[in-house]
Every structure is written in structure tokens, then in C-alpha cells.
Amino acid sequence: MMDFVLLEKALLGLFIATIVAITISKLRGKKLKLPPGPIPVPVFGNWLQVGDDLNQRNLVDYAKKFGDLFMLRMGQRNLVVVSSPELAKDVLHTQGVEFGSRTRNVVFDIFTGKGQDMVFTVYSEHWRKMRRIMTVPFFTNKVVQQYRFGWEDEAARVVEDVKANPEAATNGIVLRNRLQLLMYNNMYRIMFDRRFESVDDPLFLKLKALNGERSRLAQSFEYHFGDFIPILRPFLRGYLKLCQEIKDKRLKLFKDYFVDERKKLESIKSVDNNSLKCAIDHIIEAQQKGEINEDNVLYIVENINVAAIETTLWSIEWGIAELVNNPEIQKKLRHELDTVLGAGVQICEPDVQKLPYLQAVIKETLRYRMAIPLLVPHMNLHDAKLAGYDIPAESKILVNAWWLANNPAHWNKPDEFRPERFLEEESKVEANGNDFKYIPFGVGRRSCPGIILALPILGIVIGRLVQNFELLPPPGQSKIDTAEKGGQFSLQILKHSTIVCKPRSL
């Protein structure tokens, strides 16, 4: 009975909203020059035409029809899509302040405390403060040099564990499971000076389960209808309640098992002022100085759990998959490692710069299988102009970075996984965004600061695996499945494949 009453009220509200929208559109005096796009209908906009799955490939189809700048009206939200290097430069660099905010939806409002974090907050003094507080303990070359030995140790442990598993060399294993532990340990060493001993560690299992559920809920397209059309939001109550429960459990776990434990440790020992601090020590100091509050501390931990751990893991998994499916490239990379470093000499962080083909493999992985293909969405707080068009305030701006890096107008045979391109015709193109046709980490004020950690970690992990194993598809298969799984703005491998890891005699 209650559901029927709710439905009746929603339909009545929807009818009234339709009439109001039509009336307002006719009475509105200001005529805007909006970017081209499909003709919207009242209330629903283009939502019923284009559907929920606005992945990078679907958006390319619309760009081919409407141009490199087009607009979709998704219910009550404006979605502006940028599909050329020139327009990307305008949004991310030239007008970086105007388009430097973040848009959030009803689910991300829950998971970020309405922007109390760094990644999803609007461009403001709060963002500048959070970025500054996070940079020193996480995103500097000093951090890389301090923790690269830990990354090398974690990679060595992966090699040992895989070699100790007889199944790995015969039928194969889901290597991703062990690499997930590696990435958690890499970042938890930096954050808390902590690591998990095994994939069966109860705390690790609880942590990754909660993080996984958070990602599933946030990346899903299931809740679009209630986000696009607020009058339908009552139908999301169950979904949003689950999001709130997961958010509360995660923040409590971060606080009880990691942040508070670190505070206790610091309170019972005499800390040498010259001793090395982990990242959370710096963050807690900022809280003690009154620069941020306890919630901000926990949302910083939440950002690292998602933005640093998950995205790098996706890229490692994609890189390995492409090496398995391209054995000649794998062989060529192994030859470089053996020749430059010497047979049996394990790659370390400083060695990555001596290995141009390894760097090319990493760049090509980030181009061909971009983990965040539409970047993290941008937003303009106020009315803005772009390419002569009016962009209404609070529009969601998507830069199709995947298409910039896979457009045949700018790349030679982009549908081929070919690292050699970065040693030949694209030798001057770097992952830091020096060329706007290749911006896997974004560019400008809201670019991903994690690039300074991701590139060396990718080099160490992929390098060690190729040095120590011949990576093969399972028996009876010539290739592993690389079907894609998209999300709100993520690109993951759909199936975590079984990979045969045949040890090399070094």
C-alpha cells in the first residue's frame, strides 16, 4: 500500500514538474547558445534517448554526430562532453579555474561527506588546503625515495609467493588477487607504516570487502534515474541507505583500526623529531593545528583507498593482460631487462629510467586501457563560455581522455597495442600531459597527483613479473579475455583471468 501511495505521489509530481518545465522554457527570456546535441524532452531531457551507460565509446559515437563539443540534458543535469585536445586544453588548462570544480551526485555526496575530501570537493580554499596537506606526505619525490624499498620488497614477496604455489606454473592462478594485496601494502606502508601479511588476513579481507562494495555502489548506473530526476529520488531510499551503511562501516574501520591505533602508538613512545613519519602523522598534525577536522582526516584515508589503490591495480592488471596476449612484446621487454640490468638482477625504482621499452609498455597500457577514460568529472560553478558556446553553471564536464588517446586522427593504428609508438613517432609524448592528446592523469589544477607514485610502482611490478616468469594464458587457450567493464568513470577488466606464471631459470 505504501509503495502504491509513493508511486502515485511521484507520478503526480512528475506530471506537475513536466508542466512547470514546459512553462518555464517558454517564458524564459534569456536565449543561450548551447553546444549541439540531441533534442531534449521536458523533464527527462536526453536520458530516455541515450540511456544510463555513458561510457567512453558511446560518447565517441555522439561526438562523431554532433562534434567535439556537445551537450546532453540528463533529466535536470547538463552533461557537456569534450572530445578534442584543443578543447581539453581549454577546460583543463586555459580555463582551469572556471572548470576546476567537481560535480557530485547523490551517492558521491554520501561517500565524500558532501565534499569533505580532496578529490570530489569544489574548487575552493578547502580544496587548496586539502591538496597542500596531502602533497607532502604522499605526492613528492622524497616519498618515492623513502618508500620505494618497501615497494620493491612487496614485489619480491609476490614473486616468492607465486613461485611457492605449484598451481601457478601449471594450470595458472588469478594473479590479480595477490597483486591486490601488494597495492594495499604499498599504500598502507605510506599511510600507516602497516602491512597485511597475507591475502587471508582477516582485517585485509574486511577492508577490501567494504572498499569493493563502496566501488560497486558508486560506479553503478542503477541510481541514475534518481540523480537525474530528483522527483524520483524517493525510490532510491533503499540504495542510499545501503550506501550510508557502507560509508559508516568504512570510516569506522579506518578510525578504529588505523587512525586511532597510530595515535595510541605515538602517545606511548618518545618520537625522535628526526625520525621518519608516515603520512597519517602529517595529516593528524594538520588536524591538531586546527587546519582540518577528524572527518577530513578520514575522508583523506577514503580517497587513498579508492583513488590510489584501485586505479593503479587496474592498470597493473591491464598491463599484464596485454603482455600475456602479446608474447612478442613480453619477450622484447624481458630482453631489455636482461640486457640492461643483467640476468637475475632484479629491477629497482631507479632502474625504470634506464629502461625505455618498459616505459613505453607502461605508457601504451595507460593509452590503450586507460583506467579513468573520462577523467574525474569537472564542473563550472558559474556560467561559462567554451568554444563560443554558453555552458550553464554547474554543468558536468566530461573530457573523453580515452578518445583523445585512441583517435585515429591523432594516432597511427590506435587499435593496436604497440609500445614502439612511444619510441618512434610519439617519442616526445609523456604521461604527465605535455601533449593534450595523451592525458591519462589529467592536466592542470585537478590533475591526479598520484602519477608520481603510480609510474614507478607500475615499472617495479611489471618489471619483476616479466623478469621472473613467462606469463601465459591457461592451458588450452591462446589468449585471455580482455572484455571491458565500465563504471561511472572507470575502465576495468571484466574477468580477473587465470594466468600461468612459468618461473624462469635465472
UniProtKB/Swiss-Prot annotation:
It catalyses: (E)-cinnamate + reduced [NADPH--hemoprotein reductase] + O2 = (E)-4-coumarate + oxidized [NADPH--hemoprotein reductase] + H2O + H(+). It is an enzyme of class 1 (oxidoreductase). (E)-cinnamate binds at R214, S215, R216, L217, A218, Q219, A307. InterPro entries: Cyt_P450, Cyt_P450_CS, Cyt_P450_E_grp-I, Cyt_P450_sf. Pathway: Phenylpropanoid metabolism; trans-4-coumarate biosynthesis; trans-4-coumarate from trans-cinnamate: step 1/1. It is a single-pass membrane protein. Its cofactor is heme. Its EC number is 1.14.14.91. The chain crosses the membrane at residues 3-23. PROSITE patterns: CYTOCHROME_P450 (PS00086). Keywords: Heme, Iron, Membrane, Metal-binding, Monooxygenase, Oxidoreductase, Transmembrane, Transmembrane helix. Heme binds at C448. SUPFAM superfamilies: Cytochrome P450 (SSF48264). It is found in: Membrane. Coiled coil: none annotated. The keyword DNA damage does not apply. GO terms for molecular function: heme binding; iron ion binding; trans-cinnamate 4-monooxygenase activity. One of its GO terms (cellular component) is membrane. GO terms for biological process: lignin metabolic process. Belongs to the cytochrome P450 family. Catalyzes the first oxidative step of the phenylpropanoid pathway in higher plants by transforming trans-cinnamate into p-coumarate. The compounds formed by this pathway are essential components for lignification, pollination, and defense against ultraviolet light, predators and pathogens. This is Trans-cinnamate 4-monooxygenase. The lineage of its organism: Eukaryota, Viridiplantae, Streptophyta, Embryophyta, Tracheophyta.
